[in-house]
Curated annotation (Swiss-Prot):
Gene, per the UniProt record: CPK18
Coiled coil region boundaries: none
Record comment: activity regulation: Activated by calcium. Autophosphorylation may play an important role in the regulation of the kinase activity.
Residues bound to Ca(2+) 3: 466, 468, 470, 477
PROSITE patterns per record: EF_HAND_1 (PS00018), EF_HAND_2 (PS50222), PROTEIN_KINASE_ATP (PS00107), PROTEIN_KINASE_DOM (PS50011), PROTEIN_KINASE_ST (PS00108)
Origin species: Arabidopsis thaliana
Name of protein: Calcium-dependent protein kinase 18
Biased composition annotated in UniProt, kind: Polar residues: 14-29
Listed GO CC annotations: membrane
Keyword Phosphoprotein: yes
Length: 534
């Protein structure tokens, strides 16, 4: 009795009308099993503006005005709230392209104009990526906006899933698909961009060939985010929305959750979170753990299950990042992490390390020494990506180049030098792998992925300071182990919660978990992405 697989229409609550996917199918009647029956039964959950004037008709977007001279529009591919998508032909060379034609008269609010401008900027920024639909140009006349893009006629990922036996991919084929989605997410995140609507309908195959590359499309809900700021609005598609989106405190991690949901579906043909109503789906997302017991999960490899579980961690800080996920053994290409991009979370950890108290830096160094290098594949990949000359250490120039890739943060050279100095514990002017691990470590993930091992590691780190083994770190023990001079008591204040002049194991673990930078919970201003980061 299976019915339509895909989720309800993408939603943006509280920030205006958006309908980014002109021809994607949406949820009709409810069914747990994937099927393509009744694929046309759709239900929109998007909030729309009511009334207003044709604001877009009064705006000159500054785009080229010679579309009709350059292209000839052909058959219709799909349509949405604001316009239509067509196949078109380049009059100069005969090449076929896709053209998204948007009716200015239907843009009745300023935010809808800003949405179009932002989507064009995003396509311009990402258009050179191998797994993002190519951007050619944007045009306008008095009536329409024309966004000219690469034509991908291989169909949606959704259709490929539905065509598979039991709507399932083999693990090998699923890994190929997931790897391409993760590359898109990692590139977006480096640019300070969050896609915010990753789902099978928003990925197209370049051609109908079996090995065709996958291309991300539809950035209508995508947005740029300020460092240290979280999105408050609820956007996306119900089946793929992350818990933190529903809590109105979301960031780049939400894209990884969505890819985790897609991976689950690719491997078993079912959704991990399902209900007949949207509110029911949200309740499942917030409270339920994905099932890995029912068929076919017993026959799926432990590596695949481990990968999916680490993407579907409800606490975003403990979830793998997109770049980390590319280093996971299950998704690696031929056992190697090919072209792993620099991870924004690693760069962020290195920036934060400078702001940590001296005590926390010392505690993190002790914790890092308890971890075997073979457990640090993702950080080794990151270190190698930053170590351009492959000499086994990161120089000031290599650090500068790495930090420059994180587009939202425009750090001055003096700040880069400060970060390198904080990471360089032996003061030789370079950061080796051991020093790098201390600053780049994801402590929240250590606890989430293996709580028993976390208990052992944090205890081992604690014991390095607890010389007499009485279960507490005293100022004198800290002085003996660190060689610090002067008054030690001020150092203890951050960790000594009960103010008894010493640090217990629980206080020590709390110190390791804590972060000195906290994200502010504010709304993303509608025009922010147009004034900052490109």
């Amino acid at each position: 009795m299976g019915l339509c697989f895909s989720s309800p229409k993408a939603t943006r609550r509280g920030t205006g009308s958006r309908n980014p996917n002109p021809d994607s199918p949406t949820q009709g009647k409810a069914s747990e099993k994937v099927s393509n029956k009744n694929k046309k039964n759709t239900k929109k959950i998007q909030l729309r503006h009511q009334g207003g004037i044709p604001y877009g008709k009064r705006i000159d977007f500054g785009y080229a005005k010679d579309f009709d001279n350059r292209y000839t529009i052909g058959k219709l591919l799909g349509h949405g709230q604001f316009g239509f998508t067509y196949v078109a032909t380049d009059n100069n060379n005969g090449n076929r392209v896709a053209v998204k034609r948007i009716d200015k008269a239907k843009m009745t609010q300023p935010i809808e104009v800003e949405d179009v401008k932002r989507e064009v900027k995003i396509l311009q920024a990402l258009g050179g990526h191998e797994n993002v639909v190519g951007f050619h140009n944007a045009f306008e006349d008095k009536t329409y906006i024309y966004i000219v893009m690469e034509l991908c006629d291989g169909g949606e990922l959704l259709d490929r899933i539905l065509a598979k036996k039991d709507s399932r991919y083999t693990e090998k084929d699923a890994a190929v698909v997931v790897r391409q989605m993760l590359k898109v997410a990692a590139e977006c995140h480096l640019r300070g961009l969050v896609h915010r609507d990753m789902k099978p309908e928003n990925f197209l195959f370049k051609s109908t060939e079996e090995g065709s590359s996958l291309k991300a499309t539809d950035f209508g809900l995508s947005d740029f985010i300020k460092p240290g700021v979280k999105f408050q609005d609820i956007v996306g598609s119900a089946y793929y929305v992350a818990p933190e989106v529903l809590k109105r405190r979301s960031g780049p991690e939400s894209d990884v959750w969505s890819i985790g949901v897609i991976t689950y579906i690719l491997l078993c043909g079912r959704r991990p979170f399902w209900d007949k109503t949207q509110d029911g789906i949200f309740n499942e997302v917030m409270r339920k753990k994905p099932d890995f017991r029912e068929v076919p999960w017993p026959t799926i490899s432990n590596g695949a299950k481990d990968f999916v579980k680490k993407l579907l961690v409800k606490e975003p800080r403990a979830r793998l990042t997109a770049a980390q996920a590319l280093s996971h053994s299950w998704v690696k290409e031929g056992g190697e992490a090919s072209e792993v991009p620099i991870d924004i979370s690693v760069l962020n950890n290195m920036r934060q390390f400078v702001k940590f108290s001296r005590l926390k830096q010392i505690a993190l160094r002790a914790l890092a020494k308890t971890i075997n290098e073979d457990e640090l594949d993702d950080l080794r990949d990151q270190f190698d990506a930053i170590d351009i000359d492959k000499n086994g250490s990161i120089s000031l120039e290599e650090m500068r180049q790495a930090l420059a890739k994180d587009v939202p943060w425009k750090l001055k050279d003096a700040r880069v030098a400060e970060i390198l100095q904080a990471n360089d514990s032996n003061t030789d002017g370079l950061v080796d792998f051991t020093e790098f691990v201390v600053a780049a470590l994801h402590v929240n993930q250590l606890e989430e992925h293996d709580s028993e091992k976390w208990q052992q590691r944090s205890r081992a780190a604690f014991d390095k300071f607890d010389i007499d083994g009485d279960g507490f770190i005293t100022p004198e023990e800290l002085r003996l182990q660190t060689g610090l001079k002067g008054s030690i008591e001020p150092l203890l204040e951050e960790a000594d919660v009960d103010e008894d002049g010493r640090i217990s194991i629980n206080e020590f673990r709390r110190l390791l978990r804590s972060a000195s930078l906290k994200s502010k919970n504010v709304k993303s201003p509608p025009g922010y992405q147009l004034s900052q980061k490109m």
